[in-house]
Amino acid sequence: NLTITKALLNVIADAKTKVYGDADPSLTYQVSGLKNGDTAGAVLNGGSLSRVAGENVGVYGINQGGLGLVSANYDLSYQGNNLTITKALLNVIADAKTKVYGDADPALTYQVSGLKNGDTAGAVLNG
């Protein structure tokens, strides 16, 4: 008797990075172990990877999500990776002020740009 066993299909998630407040990048992966001219599109179901929820700066795992096999000729080995959210650049620019010698100092003010996700200057700046 000849027994044909399943081949091991390796799926490795690509590491991803985004800046706080930006949209998630596409979660992609690499495939190895295909046999006999098979393609990833023919043996995988086309499902998407998912990631651990969260939008603050930090590291979030990339999971297998809905990605799976449609071919009975393979066993799937999935290796996750991480989505890293980095800090956004916040610009604070002091407004130009003038005063006449001897007068009281004017109120010092500034402009802020680069706020994201509905953040306000009062919520992210102190002092």
Functional labels for PLM-detected ranges:
Residues 1-127:
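Short loop/turn motifs that initiate or flank beta-strands
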